[in-house]
C-alpha cells in the first residue's frame, strides 16, 4: 500500500499529534474486509516520544458522494496499478457494510465485530457522517443509531464501551444504549476500534441550552434569572438527578472502595500548570494548602464519567443522557479507568456552569467584562443552576454534594487549574474564567 498518509494524516481534524513533531505514518496492519475495503492501522512516529496508532478505513476507487469527494480523498496508490483511496466512512456503502459486520458478529482476520445481546441494528438506514468537531469520526444512521469509529487507538479496555455496556445492561435510562462494537489485538493487547449506540434523535446539547439561557438573561438586564423565559434551573435539577442515577448504577454494578485523597495527582498538575502559567503562580501555595487539608482523608470512589460537562449531556424528549465516557482527554487509559470520587463529575458540571455564564461576558467584549450588573447576573445564574443541580443530585442519590464542601472544592480547584493550563495555551482571552473561579474558591 503506497498511499500518501504522511501528507494526508496531519491535515485531518481528528489528528491528535499537532503538538508534536510529526515524522512518519506507516501502514503496519492492513486487513481486507472485502475486495474494495481495507482496515488500516497506521503507526505514527514522532521526532521524540512514543509512537501512536491510528485507524483508517480505505475504500478503493469508488468515490464518496460529491459532498465529501475532496475531504475524503487520501490519494493514489501505484503499487497495485493505478487506484485511488478514499476515507471509507464517507462512502455510504462502506459504512453500511461495517454495520452488517457488527450485526453478524463477524471476524475478519484479527478484527472482531460483536453485536450486543437482544438488540436490532438499523441495516436499512441511510448513513451520513456527523459534522461535529471531535477526535473520532461518527456516522449517523437515520434517526436510529450512531457508529463511532475511533481514530487514535490505544491499548487496553476502552472505558466508553465498557461503561456504556454496564449501564445499558443494567437498564439505566440515562445513556444511549450500546448496540455493538469492534476491536482487534496488537502485541497481545486489546484495541477498541469502534462502537454503535442508539442515536439520540431530536436531542439538544446541554451546553447549547445553557448558552441560550444566559443569552436570554443578559438580554433582559432588569430581570432576575428565575424571571427570564429561558431559565435553566429546572433542567439543571433533572440533570443532577440523571448524573446521580448513573453514579448509583456504576457503584452498584462495579463496586466502591475507600482510598486516600489523590494528593500527589492534584499537586503534580498544580506544579506543572503553575510552572507554565505565571498568572497562577501567586495562588499556587494557597491551592496546595487547600489540597493538603485532605491529605489524611479517605474518600469513597467508584467508576465515574471522568470528563463530565454540559457538552457531554444531551436533552431528549425522555430526559437527560450522558455521553462519551472516555474520560479526561490526553490521560493514559489506565488512569481514565481508575475509580474516582463522584465529586469529580459534580465538579466538572459546576465548572461548566461558570463557563456558560462567563463566556458570554467575554464574547460581548469591551466593558461587558467589567459591567457590575452583568457580572452580578452571571453569578446569580451560576448560583441558581449549581443549587438546582445539587438539589437534583441529592434528591436522587440521598447524598448532597454540598455536604462534602472541602472535597468538592478541591476537585473544582483541580479542574480550574487544568482549565488555566488549557486556556493559557489555546484561548488566552478565556483565561480570566478559570482564574476568577480559583480566586472565588480560595476566598480571595
Curated annotation (Swiss-Prot):
GO molecular function, one term: kinase activity
EC number: 2.7.1.175
Keyword Metal-binding attached: no
Gene3D superfamilies linked to this entry: 3.90.1200.10
Domain of life, per lineage: Bacteria
InterPro entries noted in UniProt: Aminoglycoside_PTrfase, Kinase-like_dom_sf, Mak_N_cap
Keywords, comma-separated and alphabetical: ATP-binding, Carbohydrate metabolism, Glycogen biosynthesis, Glycogen metabolism, Kinase, Nucleotide-binding, Transferase
Record GO biological process: carbohydrate phosphorylation; glycogen biosynthetic process; trehalose biosynthetic process
Biological pathway: Glycan biosynthesis; glycogen biosynthesis
Catalytic activities: D-maltose + ATP = alpha-maltose 1-phosphate + ADP + H(+)
Assembly and oligomerization: Monomer.
Job description of the protein: Catalyzes the ATP-dependent phosphorylation of maltose to maltose 1-phosphate. Is involved in a branched alpha-glucan biosynthetic pathway from trehalose, together with TreS, GlgE and GlgB.
Family: Belongs to the aminoglycoside phosphotransferase family.
Protein name: Maltokinase
Protein encoded by which gene: mak
